[in-house]
């Protein structure tokens, strides 16, 4: 079905080697970067000179899924590659 195809398009690898091979991986600088490697991640990120956004759904082993959507604006936030990973890392620490 269509939902299976969409999930396949949005699934992101947290494997460092795969991320290095794809400089536009939608993990580094976004929510997925803040997750532990064992997490399963589906996301859609966006970045422009005036904005950095991400919508991510992830699941850690033996935990309920988490959905986080972050919109930011302004050139300083758009260049900030640590804000979104820090938010995901903090939130994933409260999951479970």
Language model region names:
Residues 1-96:
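Penicillin-recognizing serine hydrolase domain
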């Amino acid at each position: 079905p269509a939902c299976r195809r969409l999930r396949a398009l949005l699934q992101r690898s947290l494997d460092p080697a795969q991320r290095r091979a794809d400089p536009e991986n939608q993990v580094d600088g976004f929510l997925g970067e803040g997750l532990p490697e064992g997490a399963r991640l589906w996301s859609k990120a966006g970045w422009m000179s005036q904005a950095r956004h991400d919508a991510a759904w992830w699941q850690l082993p033996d935990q309920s899924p988490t959905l986080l959507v972050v919109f930011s604006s302004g050139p300083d936030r758009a260049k900030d590659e640590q804000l979104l990973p820090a938010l995901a890392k903090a939130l994933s620490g409260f999951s479970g």
